[in-house]
Amino acid sequence: MMIKIICSAQAYTYNAYHIVKAFYPAVEITNHVEEKASNYVEINFSDGQVIAVEKEEIKAGTDAEKKAQIDKKLYKKLSEKSGKTLAWGILTGVRPTKLAMKKLEEGMEPEAFVSWFRQTYLVSEEKARLAWEIAGREKKLLDRLDYEDGYSLYVGIPFCPTVCTYCSFSSGALEDWKDFVDAYVEALCKELAFNGEVSKEKKLNSIYIGGGTPTSLNARQLERILSCIDTHFSREYLLEYTVEAGRPDSITEEKLQVIKAHKVTRISINPQTMQQKTLDVIGRKHTVEDICRTYEMARSLGFDNINMDLIAGLPGETALEMKDTLEKVGRLQPDSLTVHSLDRKSVV
């Protein structure tokens, strides 16, 4: 089966494509603009069936109002044809909690939000309530930040033990750059010293050391960076200090002890998957057992705020394997879990 989308204007193509894709995720879809088309949006199925949002169906209004009407009409017609509904309705390309947060800050009451969200975006009641709940949690955290004088510090370590096959980050394999790592660390410490000086009148709220894989550095190099941060930055207003410990094959007890000694409050151990065949495919040089061992080692050293990262949609993985990964990680009981979805980009 194939689906061809014809839109009368470029402005309608993005939402039309993603709404159709949500109903038919496994189907090949093409998107076309025909300015003289008789309908705002027309969906042509390979079996000859056609769904159209006709111009006569849409009331006059602003461009945004017309787009919203078109999206709703398209959704309802696709829902009738497929017999399905989408939990997040017509939402595409926006975080639901961003919309909920805006209404929360405007003073909207919970039930009024649920009604507005469902009517505006055709979201299910369950998801509307979830968006409101998460926005409330986020607001409690964000209200602790000082938006006038506060700031956050990010320290990037652009090295990894190896580069995973899916990765497009600006990082390189440690073996290829080993002769430059010490020089990078020293240059980084100079930059940290400078930034500590120019921001000393500000309030440091959070520190995040990421990458790359920060623990691809040896213990001495990690110690140098963490000591430099201790020297040049005040912790008086610090709410969170994270080191992305990263891959189990780069984490050692010595490195964790260095991190712990500098009073880092949160680490992230990132398996990405608990499927051994996938780890092998993506170029990870460690086992599922290594993940569990490293996690337990961190717990034994007193780390009480451990995040774990997963990626949905890794090459060859099924929904059942993702479910198995979530169950295995759940048994470890990390303090937080971050799930990314793999975005396959084409290179022209």
Predicted regions span which residues?
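Conserved non-cysteine loop/helix-boundary elements of the Radical SAM core domain that shape
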Residues: S171-V348
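A short, structured N-terminal alpha-helical element that caps or precedes a catalytic domain
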Residues: M1-A87, M101-K102
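Canonical Radical SAM [4Fe-4S] cluster-binding loop centered on the CxxxCxxC motif
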Residues: E148-A183, D280
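N-terminal [4Fe-4S]-dependent radical SAM core
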Residues: L78-T85, E105-L153
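Short beta-strand motif preference
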Residues: V41, A52, V155, I267-I269
